[in-house]
């Protein structure tokens, strides 16, 4: 294969596929077969054998390098180009678009050979591009027909047409390809299976009557899937999807398992509870007296049978089944639930709690059987409407059961759902890695082609070198003259050279003469290019994969289809000049998954076209680009006049030939086609001079640089000819009409305008205008006064005017031609023209939406706001990459929508009365396509359960469950998680860090910088003036001045982010001698343009502000992309004098800056610090006290004492205790506090005590630490403020102001007290610090989201303001129909005529931007969004009564918002947090960064090793019977059978249901009894055999307890059920034992990885949980003090409210997942009558009224949701993702924990006394008893000896030595291991003090050598004896039989010895046994070679070992 690649292919590589070609292939196959037997073994092992070339796969486009296809060869069979198929019967066909199709060369259907005209015709049709288009159109039309809900009759015929076309397509394919026998035939492509099934079904349903046809007809929907097979990019995405589904199998198993366990627990706990209802009692119509109590008791026990005998007239069953007797809350379909425990829901007066009727929600929500319980838990896990289930269950069972939900939500929901995300994300990552690796591989092939070219041109090079001295000079200087293939490729572009190339190939003999001229040219070019590469640019540093040639050679195949390949992987970034951190992010990211050659380049021309594309200004260029462009811009030979030699093509791309941007893009062909304006080039050029100044100091480099420019010009011109797409007249037109420079005066005007418009201040002004304009738009609200709206409209006109003026002035200044070359300008122009159009159409009805286009102006901010820019880019990138995914998602949604409509549409119509009271279709139904689509979309948003209940009620359970589950799993869990994974991948810290336009300051920063400078200047002048006034301070002035100047210069030298700011201020830069090091000296070097001033504040990409000493700067860790690249510029700058701080380097300063050393090692000093800061002391002399004598000394001693007290850990413990107590006290202040007088008084006193204690603590700390230290610590500030709050409220109480509103609100701030606990708990502090670290970026994203949402909010205000008002009847709460009340005035009329009507608004609406935000938050969290959506869909106009679904397509506003506002922005939060998490880990996690992969593996193995030690096994009992039992019990089989029993026990528990018959109950009782007996038996057996050792094992104690409980439970079941949890629960706990068995099952590795990840994340999750609890605690107390008395409605009722601490916690836990927060917020939004009564009295309390405080309520809930839902929960996700990836790495490592455990388990058997030694003779058995990978199978003597294990006296070997040797064998040798090994031994010694200190006296190797020497001597002696014997015996040999018998063994001995010669230690290697992976060379080389090699190696190794031992 390799050879065939080497020939650079060209247009002459195409040959027709003829009969001869076929014969040749057949002959090759025959030869192969003949060769085969000999090489059989080799072939099998050769996994690195030839593989098909990925660029020539079927379906791809022909690589560019092959040139154009000769027209006569299009659509004709050609010989296969891919060398892999050289001996396979295939041929290819290329169509006009150069797409490759591969066919089998065997006969199709046994009849049609490849040369048959019918087949040829079929092939021609098949490959024709129109054929695909036809099929595509057919499918789309078919899809349109499928969306019809009641299709008319004529569609039947259309169906036949479709079927006909599909049949025709399949026939063509079958004729062209063959049916199914060979490769590349019809059925070999899985996509064709789909076609085949679809067609078969079409015919089957047509001719065979199969009953339920509609179900079968739904199969037609699968046709939509065919689009996937037709659009190429989609196949890959689907591939990725299928991959991730495969990967999900483990997670799915785990999920199902966990859910089953939880469902079992739920079944046991809540079985039948949800049927408890409030029954009216006594019955109102009762005419007789009944002793209620006795009756009631009977009824419960015998379900009413008891008294039916006594009273015939009253039928209990009927009574309780009658719905009307239950208690219903208004507007509810289900009766109110209740429970009989004290903390469950109580019934109102006159009702009792009875189990009756069906379960809630049509009976589908229950725990009555295992399957319903499972469904309920699945719903809990996906968190859909779970607050409903939560409330129902707590109401029926009691509030204590909240614990169950906490567990399920945290372990089940968060963990499992995020595992799914983690797995999908990892599958995606791997897919990405694969594409990158493929690209690397291509690059390697590419290098081979280069080599080939180099060889071809070598002779020519000599000639060329002689001819041109210049070129020789260059190649000499340039080092190795590597020829860039661009010489041949670039020239291949022009047709002239193409012919020459052909000639060259055909006439290889006359190679030299034919191409002489051209080659010389090429040589000159490549040689000089070489010099560029070496000196000017140094692109090809060693190790960099980005060699410069590749830029020019973009025409080559691999670069075309590579997408991201140019991006060097991270690990090379140190060596490569360009660090591509964001490698797939900036460029071509749409190709992350796709094979879209099409998307990258349409065809030949456009490829050529975009080879060198100048940059669009506004885009942030990847740093690599800017590097090159800087360097190239610095070249002096570039033309400086305003006019550049430029050429334009139709796309408006200007390429400035010879101009600076000729090289701007090293990644030319992959960049967005954009442009650069002249002014900008000028600006950039001046600003970037200094970059190449150093380069140009060197005369040779200067000369080279000059020649470089000319070369570029040549190459470019040659390219130019080949790439002008448009006819020349276009260019003339562009130059004439679009570039205006006609006359002098005009140019002057233009110049002036340019100066003004391009000034940074103008930019600043425009930005301010944009902000103001946005404000103006956001000020719209309802109702508005006339004046206000007129002000707004005038403002709008003004702003439109300003923006229009800006646009026209810019056009004048820049010429339209250049103006529209820049993205931002096009955007501006678009918006301005829209605004003007909108002004014209202002009065046209229905076009008001145009106003919302003004909102796009907000995006202009992105120009100067990096984060917004980044967000838009991320969304852009993702949308690119998501393009295909979105299509797939759309197809899935479409398919399910159609399936739903076809399957359930009719049932919705027929059974509508089941689900709707008025027999009208509800809003969510599947009767037509649009509504069906909405339901599917809603399921994708995660809301499936409610729509599914409706569906199950009308259309039957099984079908609905199946369809909804499929949508849920496929759509939501897989596709949406893939979405998220894509987002996370296009999101990375690099994008965050270096968002700024790479090295251009943006204009705003320049403007702000100028202002800053002005202010500084004024300040300095004033200061100087003051100082001059006081001459005595002259000296000070002299000191200050140079520093000031230095400071100003600092600004300038930091242009272009290159130099890092040093220190906080230059005053610190003293080197060791205390003199300030002269940065000035290096400053002069830079020629600085004024546009380069930089303010650090505005420049987010400079994150480093700490001085870094040279040694410690680690480029990997800096965030700015620049650094890693510029560090390499160092190499070339060694000539520069050392003082200069060359760019990118951290400035070389001798000693680290002051104040740095103490920071590194904070030593615990035992002395207090100074009280005040130095400045204070300087200003107020009185603060200086001598501590040597007098008062000062006393003071100092006092401080020391205080310091000791404060530092004492008892003090800390005491304070923590106090904090906890005071926090706890807050929890008592609920609404009942007034009734509990004693508690109230106690709390008041306690409060005072706490306050005094905290004040004392504060004073002590002040004295001990001093103000300076106390007030520089953030935690102390927190304490200080909280103490202040208590102090103020205390004082107020004392003065009698306690009833003041302000003081009351201050008291609520006491809720912050628990925050003080934060600094005291290590775990929480870690989490908080991590969070605080993330806050800046979270805030950034939050701001950006707000801007993003602002647009939707303003749009919502435009669409819906004031339209949500409606007229209702407030007694029933029903809305009047439009026929009754049509508008506001009619409603008013009703009100005046004393009707119970009211004109009312929806609480959450779009009347202003603030409320708009609230509504959008509800929509984005999918809570309460329904009401908003219904209101929007029903709205008509302001002051009109809404009408049902009048405005149906308003749904789309919400759909769009959910996609962009919710999916994107909320997931960005996850992105930011995960990202920050990783960055912080990098900051703190020191050791990993400095370890190689190998070391890491070894280190991890060792870490695990260290924690283990051999244990004494339980001795086998001496008693014979006990011994037998012992053997039986310790066998693995026993364990497994117990496991099986446990599982069976579970199954029997699953069978249990709530309404099972008596018989069933009895059966289950007996089965359970059997199990109890069996488990008791196990327990007894183990007790007998293990004796007292039984209790040393945790699991056994666990079993024992469970068994005891089961037995007790059997006898006392009734009693226990009454008071405790049902005993059956303990059986569930047994399931935990399954965890043990997982170790024994090989296949469960994946599941164990997942559990391992969970175990690893537990500590972190515990910390986050603690933090979350703290937040909940504080909010609960706030809630109690603010919302305790609000009206009970919507989500607030008798159980869920803020009245007591417990209730508040229950509510807040529910909102943690954002569930149901809208319901809790609604009552709080009631601000006055008639919604609530501000004067209402509450008995037992002085508070009046039940109104809420809307602003406090909104703040409370929104802040809580942001903190808990977005932050804490996402941290949870981040931890899990992190640990999952770690766990996966762990499981991928060769040695895991279990392997070591297994080692020690086996060890116990061989070393029963735990001596830690084993005898040498046992070693072989021991090694063979292990499991792989440590296993060394027998025969293993040789290998073990070769390991050279140290032995102690008595031939014993220590377990560690064995383990080390075995580990080394698995991991491979490595030098650094010895150090680690020593560490490990020390650690082992520490953990096992018992380890015998042993002196090895010999080693296995030495022992063997001694043995061998003995054997050699023996053998020589024996041989001598033998010879004697043989001589004697030979004469009488035949007679003497006995001797012969003696002789044979000796002979055998000799033979064995001969064999043994090969096994002496010197000669053998530790050849890996078959179990370990074979080393590749050892397999491929013949045996003999291997022995030879091994022999020598081993001898060396032996020597080394011996020497090291000495």
Curated annotation (Swiss-Prot):
The II repeats extend over: 742-1014
Provide the free-text tissue specificity comment from this protein's UniProt record: Expressed in brain (at protein level). Detected in hippocampus, cortex and brain stem.
- Name the record gives this protein: Sodium channel protein type 2 subunit alpha
Q: Which GO terms describe its molecular function?
A: sodium channel activity; voltage-gated sodium channel activity
**GO terms under cellular component:** axon; glutamatergic synapse; intercalated disc; membrane; paranode region of axon; plasma membrane; presynaptic membrane; T-tubule
Q: Intramembrane features: residues?
A: 370-394, 929-949, 1410-1431, 1701-1723
The annotated regions of Basic and acidic residues compositional bias extend over 511-529, 596-610, 1934-1965, 1980-2006
| PTM annotation, UniProt | Sumoylated at Lys-38. Sumoylation is induced by hypoxia, increases voltage-gated sodium current and mediates the early response to acute hypoxia in neurons. Sumoylated SCN2A is located at the cell membrane.
The UniProt similarity line reads: Belongs to the sodium channel (TC 1.A.1.10) family. Nav1.2/SCN2A subfamily.
Sequence position, cross-link Glycyl lysine isopeptide (Lys-Gly) (interchain with G-Cter in SUMO1): 38
UniProt keywords (A-Z) are:
Cell membrane, Coiled coil, Disulfide bond, Glycoprotein, Ion channel, Ion transport, Isopeptide bond, Membrane, Phosphoprotein, Repeat, Sodium, Sodium channel, Sodium transport, Transmembrane, Transmembrane helix, Transport, Ubl conjugation, Voltage-gated channel
Residue ranges with Acidic residues bias: 1156-1167
Q: Tell me the segments the record calls region Binds SCN2B.
A: 918-919
- Kindly give the membrane topology term recorded for this protein: Multi-pass membrane protein
Region span, Disordered:
28-61, 494-529, 589-635, 1121-1167, 1934-2006
Gene Ontology biological process terms, A to Z: cellular response to hypoxia; dentate gyrus development; determination of adult lifespan; intrinsic apoptotic signaling pathway in response to osmotic stress; memory; nerve development; nervous system development; neuron apoptotic process
- Job of this protein: Mediates the voltage-dependent sodium ion permeability of excitable membranes. Assuming opened or closed conformations in response to the voltage difference across the membrane, the protein forms a sodium-selective channel through which Na(+) ions may pass in accordance with their electrochemical gradient. Implicated in the regulation of hippocampal replay occurring within sharp wave ripples (SPW-R) important for memory.
**Any phenotype upon disruption?**
Conditional knockout mice deficient in brain are morphologically and organogenically indistinguishable from their heterozygous littermates. They die perinatally with severe hypoxia and massive neuronal apoptosis, notably in the brainstem. Sodium channel currents recorded from cultured neurons of knockout mice are sharply attenuated.
The residues that carry sugar chains are 285, 291, 297, 303, 308, 340
Q: What is its main location?
A: membrane
Spans of repeat III: 1191-1505
Say yes or no: keyword Metal-binding present: no
In residue terms, where are the I repeats?
111-456
Disulfide connectivity? 278-338, 913-919, 951-960, 1367-1387, 1732-1747
Q: Site annotation (Important for channel closure): which residues?
A: 1490
Ranges for domain IQ come to: 1906-1935
């Amino acid at each position: 294969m390799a050879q065939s690649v080497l020939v650079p292919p060209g247009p002459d590589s195409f040959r027709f596929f003829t009969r001869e070609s076929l014969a040749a292939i057949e002959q090759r196959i025959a030869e192969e077969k003949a060769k085969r037997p000999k090489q059989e073994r080799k072939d099998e092992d050769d996994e690195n054998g030839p593989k098909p070339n990925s660029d020539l796969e079927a379906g791809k486009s022909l690589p560019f390098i092959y040139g154009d296809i000769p027209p006569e060869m299009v659509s004709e069979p050609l010989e296969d180009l891919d060398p892999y198929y050289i001996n396979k019967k295939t041929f290819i066909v290329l169509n006009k678009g150069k797409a490759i199709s591969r066919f089998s060369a065997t006969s199709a259907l046994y009849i049609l050979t490849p040369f048959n005209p019918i087949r040829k015709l079929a092939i021609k049709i098949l490959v024709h591009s129109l054929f695909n288009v036809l099929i595509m159109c057919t499918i789309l039309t078919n899809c349109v027909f499928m969306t019809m809900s009641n299709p008319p009759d004529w569609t039947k015929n259309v169906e036949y047409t479709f079927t006909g076309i599909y049949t025709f397509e399949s026939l063509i394919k079958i004729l062209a390809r063959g049916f199914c026998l060979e490769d590349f035939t019809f059925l070999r492509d899985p996509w064709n299976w789909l076609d085949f099934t679809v067609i078969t079904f079409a015919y089957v349903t047509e001719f065979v009557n199969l009953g339920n046809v509609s179900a079968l007809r739904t199969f037609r929907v699968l046709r939509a899937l065919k689009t996937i097979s037709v659009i190429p990019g989609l196949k890959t995405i689907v591939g990725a999807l299928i991959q991730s589904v495969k990967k999900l199998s483990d997670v799915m198993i785990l999920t199902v398992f966990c859910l089953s366990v939880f469902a079992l627990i739920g079944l046991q706990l809540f079985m039948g509870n949800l049927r408890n209802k409030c029954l009216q009692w006594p019955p109102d119509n009762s005419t007789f007296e009944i002793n209620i109590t006795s009756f009631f008791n009977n009824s419960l026990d015998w379900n009413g049978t008891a008294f039916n005998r006594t009273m015939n007239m009253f039928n209990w069953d009927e009574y309780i089944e009658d719905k009307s007797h239950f208690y219903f809350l208004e507007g509810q379909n289900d009766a109110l639930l209740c429970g009989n425990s004290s903390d469950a829901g109580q019934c109102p007066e006159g009702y009792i709690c009875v189990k009756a009727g069906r379960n809630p929600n049509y009976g589908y929500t229950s725990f009555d059987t295992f399957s319903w319980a499972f469904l309920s838990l699945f719903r809990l896990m996906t968190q859909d409407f779970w607050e409903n289930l939560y409330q129902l269950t707590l109401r029926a069972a009691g509030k204590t059961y909240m614990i169950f939900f906490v567990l399920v939500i945290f372990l089940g929901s968060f963990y499992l759902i995020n595992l799914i995300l983690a797995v999908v994300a990892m599958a995606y990552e791997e897919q990405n890695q694969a594409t990158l690796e493929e690209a690397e591989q291509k690059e390697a092939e590419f290098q081979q082609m280069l080599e080939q070219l180099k060889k071809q041109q070598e002779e020519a090079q000599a000639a060329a070198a002689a001819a041109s001295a210049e070129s020789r000079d260059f190649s000499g200087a340039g080092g190795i003259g590597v020829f860039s293939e661009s010489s041949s490729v670039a020239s291949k572009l022009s047709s002239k050279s193409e012919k020459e190339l052909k000639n060259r190939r055909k006439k290889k003999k006359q190679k030299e003469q034919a191409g002489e001229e051209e080659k010389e040219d090429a040589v000159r070019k490549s040689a000089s290019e070489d010099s560029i590469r070496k000196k000017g640019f140094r692109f090809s540093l060693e190790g960099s994969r980005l060699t410069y040639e590749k830029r020019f050679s973009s025409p080559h195949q691999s670069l075309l289809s590579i997408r991201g390949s140019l991006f060097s992987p991270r690990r090379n970034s140190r060596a490569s000049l360009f660090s591509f951190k964001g490698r797939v992010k900036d460029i071509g990211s749409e190709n992350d998954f796709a094979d879209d050659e099409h998307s990258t380049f349409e065809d030949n021309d456009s490829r050529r076209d975009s080879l060198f594309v100048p940059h669009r200004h506004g885009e942030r260029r990847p740093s690599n680009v800017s590097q090159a462009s800087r360097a190239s811009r610095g070249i002096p030979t570039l033309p400086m006049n305003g006019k550049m030699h430029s050429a334009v093509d139709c796309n408006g791309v200007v390429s400035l030939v010879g101009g600076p941007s000729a090289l701007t893009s090293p990644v030319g062909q992959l960049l967005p086609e954009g442009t650069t304006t002249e002014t900008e080039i000028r600006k950039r050029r001046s600003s970037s001079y200094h970059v190449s100044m150093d380069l140009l100091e060197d005369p040779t480099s200067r000369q080279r640089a000059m020649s470089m420019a000319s070369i570029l010009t040549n190459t470019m011109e040659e390219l130019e000819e080949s790439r002008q797409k448009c006819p020349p007249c276009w260019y003339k037109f562009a130059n004439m009409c679009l570039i205006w420079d006609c006359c002098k005066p005009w140019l002057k005007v233009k110049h002036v305008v340019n100066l003004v418009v391009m000034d940074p201040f103008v930019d600043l002004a425009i930005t301010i205008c944009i902000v103001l304009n946005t404000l103006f738009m956001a000020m719209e609200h309802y109702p508005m006064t006339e004046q206000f709206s007129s002000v707004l409209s005038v403002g709008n006109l003004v702003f439109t005017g300003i923006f229009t003026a800006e646009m026209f002035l810019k056009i004048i200044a820049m010429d339209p031609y250049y103006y529209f070359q820049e993205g931002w300008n096009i955007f501006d122009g678009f918006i301005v023209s829209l605004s003007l159009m909108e002004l014209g159409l202002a009065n046209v009805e229905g076009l008001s939406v145009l106003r919302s286009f003004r909102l796009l102006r907000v995006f202009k901010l992105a120009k100067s706001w990096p984060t917004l820019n980044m967000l838009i880019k991320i969304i852009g990138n993702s949308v690119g990459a998501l393009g295909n995914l979105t299509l797939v998602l759309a197809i899935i949604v479409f398919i399910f929508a159609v399936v739903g409509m076809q399957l359930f549409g009719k049932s919705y119509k027929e059974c509508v009365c089941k689900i709707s009271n008025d027999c009208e279709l509800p809003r969510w139904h599947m009767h037509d396509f649009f509504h069906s689509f909405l339901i599917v979309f809603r399921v994708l948003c995660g809301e499936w359960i409610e729509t599914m209940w409706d569906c199950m009620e009308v259309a039957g359970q099984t079908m609905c469950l199946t369809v909804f589950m499929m949508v849920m799993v496929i759509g939501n869990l897989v596709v949406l998680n893939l979405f998220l994974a894509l987002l996370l991948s296009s999101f990375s810290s690099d994008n965050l860090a270096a968002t700024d336009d790479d090295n251009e300051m943006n204009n705003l920063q320049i403007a702000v910088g100028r202002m800053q400078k002005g202010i500084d200047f004024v300040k300095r002048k004033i200061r100087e003036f003051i100082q001059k006034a006081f001459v005595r301070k002259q000296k000070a002035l002299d000191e200050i001045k140079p520093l000031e100047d230095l400071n100003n210069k600092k600004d300038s030298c930091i242009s272009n982010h290159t130099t890092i700011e040093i220190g906080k201020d230059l005053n610190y830069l003293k080197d060791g001698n205390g003199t300030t090091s002269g940065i000035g000296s290096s400053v002069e070097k830079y020629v600085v343009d004024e546009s380069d001033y930089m303010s650090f504040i505005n420049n987010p990409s400079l994150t480093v502000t700490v001085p870094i000493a040279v040694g410690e700067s680690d480029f990997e860790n800096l965030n700015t992309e620049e650094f890693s690249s510029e560090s390499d510029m160092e190499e070339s700058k060694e000539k520069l004098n050392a003082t200069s701080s060359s760019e990118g380097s951290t400035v070389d300063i001798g000693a680290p800056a002051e104040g740095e050393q103490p920071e590194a090692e904070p030593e615990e000093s035992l002395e207090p610090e100074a009280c005040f800061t130095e400045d204070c002391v300087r200003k107020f002399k009185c603060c200086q006290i001598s501590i040597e004598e007098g008062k000062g000394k006393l003071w100092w001693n006092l401080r020391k004492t205080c310091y000791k007290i404060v530092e004492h850990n008892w003090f800390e413990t005491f304070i923590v205790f106090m904090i906890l107590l005071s926090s706890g006290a807050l929890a008592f202040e609920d609404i009942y506090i007034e009734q509990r007088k004693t508690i109230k008084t106690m709390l008041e006193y306690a409060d005072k005590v706490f306050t005094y204690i905290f004040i004392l603590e504060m004073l002590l700390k002040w004295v001990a630490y001093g103000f300076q230290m106390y007030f520089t610590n953030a935690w102390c500030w927190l304490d200080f403020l909280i103490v202040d709050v208590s102090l103020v409220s205390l004082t107020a109480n004392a003065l009698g102001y306690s009833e003041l509103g302000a003081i009351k609100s201050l008291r609520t701030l006491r809720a912050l007290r628990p925050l003080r606990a934060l600094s005291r708990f290590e775990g929480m502090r870690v989490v908080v610090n991590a969070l605080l670290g993330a806050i800046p970026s979270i805030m950034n994203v939050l701001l950006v989201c707000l801007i993003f949402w602002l647009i939707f909010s303003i749009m919502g205000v435009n669409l819906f303001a004031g339209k949500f008002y409606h007229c209702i009847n407030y007694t029933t709460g029903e809305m009047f129909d439009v026929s009754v009340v049509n508008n506001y005035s009619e409603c008013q009329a009703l009100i005046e005529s004393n009707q119970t009507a009211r004109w009312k608004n929806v609480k959450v609406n779009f009347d202003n931007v603030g409320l708009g935000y609230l509504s959008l938050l509800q929509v984005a969290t999918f809570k309460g969004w329904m009401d908003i959506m219904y209101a929007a869909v029903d709205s008509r106009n302001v002051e009109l009564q809404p009408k049902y679904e009048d405005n149906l397509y308003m749904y789309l506003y919400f759909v769009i918002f959910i996609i962009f506002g919710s999916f994107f922005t909320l997931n960005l939060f996850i992105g930011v947090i995960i990202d920050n998490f990783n960055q912080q880990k990098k900051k703190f996690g020191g050791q990993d960064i400095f370890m190689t992969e190998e070391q890491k593996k070894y280190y991890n193995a060792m870490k695990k090793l260290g924690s283990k030690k051999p244990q004494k096994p339980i001795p086998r009992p001496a008693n014979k019977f006990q011994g037998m039992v012992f053997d039986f019990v310790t066998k693995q089989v026993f364990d497994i059978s117990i496991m099986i029993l446990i599982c069976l026990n579970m199954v029997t528990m699953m069978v249990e249901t709530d309404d099972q018959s008596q018989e069933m109950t009895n059966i289950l009782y007996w089965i359970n009894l059997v199990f109890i007996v069996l488990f008791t038996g196990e327990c007894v057996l183990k007790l007998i055999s293990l004796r007292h050792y039984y209790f040393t094992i945790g699991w056994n104690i666990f079993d024992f307890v469970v068994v005891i409980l089961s037995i007790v439970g059997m006898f006392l079941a009734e009693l226990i059920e009454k008071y405790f949890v049902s005993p059956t629960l303990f059986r569930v706990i047994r399931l935990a034992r399954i965890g043990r068995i997982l170790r024994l099952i090989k296949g469960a590795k994946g599941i164990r990885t997942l559990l391992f990840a969970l175990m690893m994340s537990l500590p972190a999750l515990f910390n986050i949980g603690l933090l979350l609890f703290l937040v909940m605690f504080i909010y609960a107390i706030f809630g109690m003090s603010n919302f305790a008395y609000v009206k009970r409605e919507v989500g607030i009722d008798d159980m869920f409210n803020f009245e007591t601490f417990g209730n508040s916690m229950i509510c807040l836990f529910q909102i943690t997942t954002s569930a149901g927060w809208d319901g809790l917020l609604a009552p709080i939004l009631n601000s006055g009558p008639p919604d609530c009564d501000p004067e209402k009295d509450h008995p037992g309390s002085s508070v009046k009224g039940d109104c809420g405080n809307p602003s406090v309520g909104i703040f409370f809930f929104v802040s809580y949701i942001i903190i808990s839902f977005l932050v804490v929960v996402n941290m949870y996700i981040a931890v899990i993702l992190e640990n999952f990836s770690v766990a996966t790495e762990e499981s991928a490592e060769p040695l895991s924990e279990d392997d070591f455990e297994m080692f020690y388990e086996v060890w116990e058997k061989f070393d029963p006394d735990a001596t830690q030694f084993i005898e040498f003779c046992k070693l072989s058995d021991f090694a063979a008893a292990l499991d792989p990978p440590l296993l060394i199978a027998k025969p293993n003597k040789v290998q073990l000896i070769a390991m050279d294990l140290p032995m102690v006296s008595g031939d014993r070997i220590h377990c560690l030595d064995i383990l080390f040797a075995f580990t080394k064998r698995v991991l491979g040798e490595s030098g650094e291991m010895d150090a680690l090994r020593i560490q490990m031994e020390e650690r082992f010694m520490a953990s096992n003090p018992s380890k015998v200190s042993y002196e090895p006296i010999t080693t296995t190797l030495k022992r063997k050598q001694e043995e061998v020497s003995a054997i050699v001597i023996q053998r020589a002696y024996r041989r001598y004896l033998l010879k004697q014997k043989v001589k004697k015996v030979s004469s009488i040999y035949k007679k003497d039989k006995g001797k012969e018998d003696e002789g044979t063994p000796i002979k055998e001995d000799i033979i064995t010895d001969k064999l043994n010669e090969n096994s002496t230690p010197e000669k053998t290697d530790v050849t890996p046994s078959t179990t370990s992976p074979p080393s590749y060379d050892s397999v491929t080389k013949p045996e003999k070679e291997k022995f030879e090699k091994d022999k020598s190696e081993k001898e060396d190794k032996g020597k080394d070992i011996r020497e090291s031992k000495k």
